[in-house]
Amino acid sequence: MKLSSEKLPKNPFSLSQYAAKQQKFFQWKKEKPDYYLHANLVDTALQFLKERIRRGDAMAYFLRGQLYFEEGWYEEALAQFEEIQEKDHQAIYQLGVMYYDGLGTIANAEKGVNYMRKILDSSCPQTMHLKFAAAYNLGRAYFEGKGVKRSDEEAERLWLLAADNGNPKASVKAQSILGLFYSMKEPKELEKAFFWHSEACGNGSLESQGALGLMYFYGQGIRQDTDAALHCLREAAERGNVYAQGTLVEYYYKMKFFTKCVSFSKRIADYDEVHDIPMIAHVTDCLPEFIIKGMAMAAFYHGRCLQLGLGIMKDEESAKHYYSKACRLNPTLADELHSLLIHQRI
């Protein structure tokens, strides 16, 4: 299970709130409507921050680095954060993320871990909004064994610290990951998994909303409840959870809603493997592993409908294309589904 870093937690000094206090920042909107183009907006923001820096505004240094980071200009962001790390804890946090993930520099997990420890161990009040996220990231390092010796026990301890008993202001990402952690470890602790997915879902986690649907569907950690399962899965699917979408495709097929299955499965199966998966992961904060699994499931069932002419005109050549895509995306899942097909259970 490949995890991702926790994004920089919001604090009262976001770029938008900061800029909103500076009326001159928005004058260009009234004077030059064509500047609504994104590139011009970024350029205007940079010019504004440059002027604030010239006037001695300390916060503007970090905001410039963060703007570089959000635009994907990682080398410039790294240089800016390195310059101000002694004066800005948010810069330290971002350096931890960048060194661990290799953004704008060669990955150095040990260095990334050290930066995160600085945040977690700091007694400075200005680090309070960063501590839960730093604990999540350190837990990730122990889970992956990067920069530290691998330890599921230490990962669990840090994630529990980050999750803070379901506090909505803590790390919702940690709450969701705990749900996955308890459902995947041996022996499984499904009641704990259900609890943490419930907490994370209540705090807005799309990943956990889909996971709850599956747990209700199969009666894992909770009594089986198909209505509750479909409610969770449909809401998660509408919000962009691709694994939930793939699970609904399977449900529609088994219930013989073939027309619905075909139209829904094609849309999911036709996602681009190279470009769409990273984009969906970024927008939804869902793990690529499960996005790929949802796509593979949709591709396989779409292929089956095409092969048999269920809800669509029979087309064996197109069916082969979708079967191949399912195998390419997730060979293990495709093999399991093919086995069910051979035994006439699909």
UniProtKB/Swiss-Prot annotation:
GO cellular component terms, semicolon-separated: cytoplasm
Ranges occupied by Sel1-like repeats: 92-124, 132-167, 172-205, 206-241, 242-276, 296-331
Domain of life of the organism encoding this protein: Eukaryota
Pfam families the record matches: Sel1, TPR_8
SUPFAM superfamilies membership: HCP-like
Disulfide bonds: none
Main subcellular location: cytoplasm
Cross-referenced Gene3D superfamilies: Tetratricopeptide repeat domain
TPR repeat ranges per the UniProt record: 58-91
Location within or outside the cell: Cytoplasm
Function text: May act as an adapter that regulates LRP2 function.
Assembly information from the UniProt record: Interacts with LRP2.
Annotated protein name in UniProt: LRP2-binding protein
Organism name: Mus musculus
